[in-house]
Amino acid sequence: MDQLIQVVEAAQERQDLPEIRPGDTIKMQLRVIEGEKERLQAYEGVIISDSGAGTNRTITVRKISNGVGVERIIPLNSPNIESIEVRKYGKTRRAKLSYLRKRTGKAALRVKERKVSAPAGK
């Protein structure tokens, strides 16, 4: 039974998303439905948490909007995610970056940058 669940989840998991980790700064396009209309909304911030696995994987993205910290928990397998683009790759020593919540201003989003080699063939 457990193997059957794994097979079904693997078939339903999204494959078009980039590899992301806590500390990365991402820009995502989210599909928002307002009444009859549908539009794309950009959301850019730092990943401060990553939890779950497979189809249940979620990330917490934090941004500063008008001086106020805004966090959003987003299921990565959601059909409302149009695209995710990694702006900066962050280098951290923690899996959960909850200490960023105490910071203000530019320091609230400052994470050391890690070097990433370009994918082969590009």
UniProtKB/Swiss-Prot annotation:
Q: What InterPro entries is this protein classified in?
A: Ribosomal_bL19, Ribosomal_bL19_CS, Ribosomal_bL19_sf, Translation_prot_SH3-like_sf
Can you cite an annotated GO cellular component?
Answer: cytosolic large ribosomal subunit
Q: Name one GO biological process term.
A: translation
For this UniProt record, the keywords arranged alphabetically read as follows:
Ribonucleoprotein, Ribosomal protein
Question: Which Gene3D superfamilies does the protein's record reference?
Answer: 2.30.30.790
Q: What Pfam families does the record tag this protein with? A: Ribosomal_L19 (PF01245)
Protein family: Belongs to the bacterial ribosomal protein bL19 family.
What NCBIfam families is this protein classified in? rplS_bact (TIGR01024)
Function in brief = This protein is located at the 30S-50S ribosomal subunit interface and may play a role in the structure and function of the aminoacyl-tRNA binding site.
Could you tell me what this protein is called? Large ribosomal subunit protein bL19
Naturally occurring in which organism (per UniProt): Prosthecochloris aestuarii (strain DSM 271 / SK 413)
